[in-house]
Amino acid sequence: AAEKPLLLKSYHRLVDQVCAIYGGTIETEDNHDVLVTFDKPHEHMTHCVNALCAAQFFFGLYKAFNAQRAAHGKSNLSIQIVVHTGNLEELSSLTEKAAELSRRERQEHMVISRQVAYHPELQQRVLQANNCTPLASGAVSLARLSSDYQDLLDMQISHFSPDL
């Protein structure tokens, strides 16, 4: 229990690293939930591509960090990642939808909302059907991004993992 604040700080440092590379604004809630927004919509859904890459990069670092801690007999935390999209003027409802998906869909992989999973531009650029598992809620469990993106992310994860 005494270690939890230090663990949370370590995970937050990972979020900081990821957002320094992919952009995004970080907000930490009182309950330690972390919200990262990519608030500048760009042509070709680049902001969503950045959000997916950032989430997958964080997920890889998080898994590597947990594996390192487990190898030394140390505790770790289980984190759920949900990627959702919408108008930031409706941030409260977007956050609630993401939180609802997080509570409902406890998955080993990242969860992406229906709006992200079925967006034609994202399906064409970064999502491959064989990496996506439909969930009862209509959301999707995403194991990995398309190879062009995932291969780069895997290299980044390998590069940053030893220094965790």
Predicted features along the sequence, with ranges:
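Short helix/loop segment flanking the catalytic signature motif in cyclic-nucleotide metabolism enzymes
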Residues: 3-7, 29-76, 90-97
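N-terminal cationic-hydrophobic initiation segments that often serve targeting/anchoring roles
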Residues: 16, 59, 102-103
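A glycine-rich, hydrophobic loop/mini-helix early in the fold
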Residues: 21-25, 33
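Extended hydrophobic secondary-structure segments that form protein cores and membrane-embedded regions
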Residues: 78-84
